[in-house]
Amino acid sequence: MTGNNPTDRSKVGTKRHILTDKQGIPLSAIISSASTHDIKAVTDVIDNTVIKRTFVSKPKRGKRQRRKYHHLCLDRAYNSKSTENEIINRGYVPHIPYKRKRGQVRKKVHQKQYDSVRNKRWVVERTNSWHNRFRKLYIRYEKKVENYLGLVQLSYSIIIYRKIVLGEALNLR
C-alpha cells in the first residue's frame, strides 16, 4: 500500500491574497490554504474589492470622457494567458513578469519588464509587513477560516485608519 501522492503538495498553513492601492492601503483580502495556487485566487481578490473603481474619467472643459486604465502589478506566480484574459475582462491592465523555464537565459526585454514590476512590488510586501505586526495574526491560532478572515479585516481597517485618518500615508505629520 502506498502513501499520499507526493505531487499533491498538501502544505499546512494559509495564504493571504491582498489587493492594495499604490500607497499600500489594502482594498481587498482573501484567505486560502497554502497549497492553493495563486492563479486560482486572483479573480476572487479583484471581485471582492470593497471600493469599486470608476473606469471613465470626468470630462475636462472642452474635452470628452476618456477611459481610465487601472494597472495591476502581479508577481511571476500569476503568469498565464487565462489569468491575463480574466484581468483584462475586469478592466485592468496586467503587468506580470515573464516566467522563464529552468535553463532558459533571461532576455533583456523580459529583464526590463521584471524590473518595472519588481520596483512596484515592494508596496505589497510593506503591507504584508504592516499586517505581520499584529501579534495575533502573525501565527494563526484560529481554527475557523471565518474567524481568521475577520481578524485580518479588522487589522486592515486599523491599518487604513492609521494611514488615512492619522495622516501617515500622506506625510501630514
Which stretches of residues belong to each language-model region?
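Generic structural signal for secondary-structure transition and capping sites
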Residues: I51-T54, K136, I159, K163
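Helix-centered, glycine/charged polyanion-binding patches within enzymatic domains
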Residues: F55-K143
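A general lysine-centric signal
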Residues: K15, K143-K144
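Aromatic-acidic/polar surface patches that form glycan- and anion
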Residues: S35, K144-N147
